[in-house]
Amino acid sequence: LLTPDGIRTAVAALRAETGTDRMCRLVIYPEHISADVMVDGSNTRYESWTYRPGEGATKGIIEGTTSPTQSPFRAGAFDWDAVPALFERAVKELNVMDITSRYLVVSGADPTFGDPMGMSAYLSNGYRHSGYLAADHRGKVTRVMPNDEEY
């Protein structure tokens, strides 16, 4: 699912089930997507949803309210075509060898600290080495946080 088409398919399935693409958190793994989808008419309440290929979108058991560092965003505002290049750059720059996990975290603007909405590409391995690239909603990298541990 970590492809532009995979993400678009999942977001479309979530929108078909929930009636919206407004979320406060979206985490995209190769096998599934977890989303905190905003409740209709609210800027603070959300419900958890999951998308898996072959199963579609399913509502989870978690309901909650946004934290002071979260705000709603529209999934359609992100340039999903930028995702492959983010992960290509992450592999080159994050100093994570023997990668066992990769995922993308998408979040709205942070009203507390003033960070804009964006997406972060994470890599990690079985030795607890990890790093991430943070980018704006168009895919422009704004921060590189490589693994700094010795191999």
Model-predicted regions and their roles:
Residues 1-47:
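Extracytoplasmic low-complexity, Pro/Thr/Ser/Ala/Gly-rich segments
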Residues 53-75, 131-151:
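A short, surface-exposed interaction/processing loop segment used at functional sites
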Residues 43-50, 132-134:
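Charge-rich, low-aromatic oligomerization/scaffolding segments with amphipathic character
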Residues 4-12, 80, 87, 151:
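Ampiphathic alpha-helical segments that act as solvent-exposed interaction surfaces
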Residues 37-41, 64, 122-124:
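Secondary-structure transition/turn motif
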Residues 58-100:
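Long, charged/polar, surface-exposed segments that mediate recognition or autoinhibition
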Residues 15-33, 92-114:
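Short glycine-rich, low-complexity/disordered patches
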Residues 97-151:
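Extracellularly exposed regions in secreted/surface proteins, prominently low-complexity, repeat-rich
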